[in-house]
């Protein structure tokens, strides 16, 4: 969330500009230029935010840089950074007013749990030695999305759903070779929207 006195509109405009550039480069396969745009995403978004939100975004920024690489070590580093980021988001989201939606309407969690179970069942035989790290990561991701839903704020809940979408697209591509046309563009479009909505 914005802190009082934050840069507000200018920071939001800067993030939108960097995000639009990176999504365009991702969709057109210009990986080299993305070494300039992708590392700027989270540092731009965290300007003027509260401390807990900044921590979650900073961990996302570490993951962004790690995943510019293509080695197994880069993937592991990115996975670890984003897992820590999801845990940080859970802490940040719990401080927001209006939480408690799931206590009143627990059935709202069912689609999230079904998506988590279905994706893991599909990926389990395909992830090899990564299956336990992927399971741990997906559990943290689902918990973060449910925490976002529990705030009772539609935009925040949408951010959680979009993050689920982002990482589902990534997992299906990496482990099952399932991808959309301009796949990386869709991944980044959902990702930058997710982080922006969670941070708003």
Tell what function each PLM region has:
Residues 1-200:
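Short amphipathic, positively biased membrane-proximal segments
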């Amino acid at each position: 969330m914005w802190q009082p006195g934050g840069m507000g509109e200018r920071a939001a405009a800067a993030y939108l500009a960097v995000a639009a550039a990176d999504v365009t480069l991702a969709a057109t396969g210009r990986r080299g230029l993305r070494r300039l745009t992708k590392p700027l995403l989270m540092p731009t978004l965290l300007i003027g935010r509260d401390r807990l939100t900044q921590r979650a975004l900073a961990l996302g920024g570490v993951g962004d840089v790690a995943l510019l690489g293509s080695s197994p070590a880069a993937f592991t580093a990115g996975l670890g950074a984003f897992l820590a980021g999801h845990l940080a988001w859970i802490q940040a989201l719990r401080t927001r007013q209006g939480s408690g939606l799931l206590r009143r309407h627990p059935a709202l969690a069912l689609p999230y749990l079904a998506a988590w179970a279905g994706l893991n069942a599909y990926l389990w035989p395909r992830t090899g030695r990564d299956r336990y790290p992927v399971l741990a990561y997906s559990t943290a991701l689902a918990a973060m999305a449910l925490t976002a839903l529990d705030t009772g704020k539609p935009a925040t809940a949408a951010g959680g759903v979009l993050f689920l979408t982002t990482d589902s697209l990534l997992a299906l591509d990496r482990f099952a070779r399932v991808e959309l046309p301009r796949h990386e563009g869709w991944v980044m479009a959902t990702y930058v929207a997710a982080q922006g909505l969670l941070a708003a």
